[in-house]
From Swiss-Prot:
InterPro entries: Na+/H+_antiporter_NhaB. Keywords: Antiport, Cell inner membrane, Cell membrane, Ion transport, Membrane, Sodium, Sodium transport, Transmembrane, Transmembrane helix, Transport. It comes from the Bacteria. Na(+)/H(+) antiporter that extrudes sodium in exchange for external protons. Belongs to the NhaB Na(+)/H(+) (TC 2.A.34) antiporter family. HAMAP family: NhaB. GO terms for molecular function: sodium:proton antiporter activity. This is Na(+)/H(+) antiporter NhaB.
Length: 499
């Protein structure tokens, strides 16, 4: 209990986070004031490093609060403006719509997803085959849907599996309220199996998450920056696929081979198998659910399955923006499954809205990068090189910058600079196409290195699943490292060989 008002304010500041973390954030705020007076450029780079720190410490404190304080200070210090932040948010409004509605739509589909994936998980005993399936299916889906949507599905499935076993391990009855984020009631007998199960889920989720990048690089609709680059280059769906195939196909093969090697060797946190005791619990759960499933439950599953088909076709044919399709899914699922209570509907939005707010804070950091021209020296350096070396260097530069910033922003900056060079007659149309391919590959493949680069990875890191399976920023970086090396090497090699 705080003994004074000063102690009370300190206790309330960032809540239950450790004192060293609170002092670090305050230190950042003080340092930024000094740096902004010396060099706004340096202050901008300091802000990027500080924001990455808040992401890395996501399990200590949700990054929205410390990151938000840093973003507010950046505006107050003049490193960017409220108008610039608004412009960045507006430019990414499609992503915000997606998070608001599509993730909530997936929430209302979780019974069907858990049903399908339970059958898959229990039907395939080989962890290697299961991992390859997760990675390949995620890649195929991401090529036609959206990486965030696919990640939301993976998260919903993993949370469902985890909750089933955690309830059993805690001795909680099926009908009772249960907090699967608390381990206080987990019996000692089940703790080892629970830890192994966490490791099992971590590896599957990371294989699936990287799979979204493998598929995302291949098609026009795979990632938001693909659409942007294709629009400027004038490529349609088929042209985009064909021009990217010399990179995307080897990357997919390399990614799947990496998946297999990781599961065979067990390095970097992979290789954990589903414990027999956990499998039995899931088998029993599936039998109980099947036995008690009445006509009402079956009707709900059927509705969810039909709406899932509608979702796939609507996204693949791009009938509307992804977020609006998400709203369509919410309306269809709640209307035909009788979910009309406002509080029940509200639960669906709990997962995505904190992350949506965090993403807006991230866009404030992107606004600082833009206004302070933090990436300009790198761009100028690459464009000053001889043409033969530009494509590989564009791939490397885009890859490195996408590891610390949003890959959509990096792609936007680079493709606009290249377009300006083409319009000025500095480069030919053929060379412009080569650089556009290098930019697209560079922002898609190496950006799996950290959660900063891809919105889907950042969403996974800050989701309700991450603390359950002990998936921290550092753990994600370590688990992504083999993929980063392979995809970076394959991508760079393909750019050099084929372009």
């Amino acid at each position: 209990m705080p003994q004074s008002m000063t102690n009370a304010f300190w206790h309330n500041f960032l809540g239950h986070t450790p004192n060293w973390y609170k002092k670090t954030i305050l230190g950042f705020l003080v340092i930024n004031i000094v740096l902004s007076q010396v060099s706004p450029f340096l202050a901008g780079w300091a802000l990027i490093i500080e924001f990455i720190f808040t992401l890395a410490m996501a399990l200590k404190c949700y990054p929205l609060q410390p990151g938000g304080l840093l973003a507010i200070q950046a505006v107050l210090l003049g490193l960017t403006s409220a108008d610039s932040v608004y412009h960045e948010v507006l430019a990414n409004f499609k992503v915000i719509l997606l998070l608001m509605f599509m993730v909530a739509g997936i929430y209302f589909m979780k019974d069907m997803l858990l049903f399908v994936f339970t059958k898959i998980l229990l039907g395939i005993r080989s962890k290697l085959l299961l991992s390859l399936l997760f990675s390949f299916v995620a890649a195929v889906l991401s090529a036609f849907l959206d990486a965030l949507t696919v990640t939301a599905v993976l998260i919903a499935v993993a949370v469902g599996f985890y909750a089933v076993y955690h309830r059993f391990a805690s001795g909680s009855g099926h009908g009772n309220d249960h907090d699967h984020s608390a381990d206080d009631n987990v019996h000692d007998l089940h703790r080892e199996d629970l830890d192994t199960f966490r490791s099992f889920l971590r590896s599957l989720i990371m294989h699936g998450a990287v799979g979204t990048a493998l598929g995302g690089v291949a098609t026009l609709v795979g990632e938001p920056q693909n659409l942007l680059i294709a629009e400027i280059a004038g490529w349609n769906f088929i042209e985009f696929y064909l021009v990217m195939a010399p990179i995307s196909v080897p990357a997919l093969i390399g990614g799947l081979l990496t998946c297999a090697i990781l599961e065979k060797t067990g390095i970097c946190g992979y290789g954990a198998k589903l414990p027999d005791s956990v499998r039995q619990i899931l088998v029993d759960f599936d039998k109980k659910e099947t036995a008690k499933r009445g006509f009402g439950d079956k009707a709900q599953l059927l509705v969810q399955a039909v709406v899932a088909v509608v979702l796939v076709f609507a996204l693949a044919l791009h009938l509307a923006e992804v977020g609006l399709i998400g709203l369509l899914i919410i309306v269809l699922l709640t209307a035909f499954n009788g979910i009309t209570d406002e509080h029940r509907i509200g639960h669906a939005f709990e997962e995505a809205l904190p992350f949506t707010a965090l993403l807006v804070v991230f866009f404030a950091v992107v606004a600082v990068i833009h206004d302070q021209h933090l990436f300009t020296p790198v761009i100028d350096y690459v464009l000053a090189m001889e043409q033969g070396a530009q494509a590989p260097m564009f791939f490397v530069a885009n890859g490195v910058l996408s590891m610390i910033s949003d890959n959509v922003f990096v792609a936007t900056v680079y493709i606009n600079e290249v377009k300006a060079a083409f319009d000025a007659g500095t480069i030919s149309r053929e060379h412009f196409d080569v650089l556009a391919v290098a930019i697209n590959a560079g922002t898609n493949l190496p950006s799996v290195a950290t959660p900063n680069g891809q919105a889907a990875f950042l969403f996974l890191l800050t989701s309700a699943l991450a603390p359950l399976i002990r998936l921290s920023y550092g753990k994600m970086v370590i688990m992504a490292l083999p993929y980063t090396i392979v995809l970076g090497a394959v991508g760079l090699g393909s750019v050099i060989l084929f372009y």
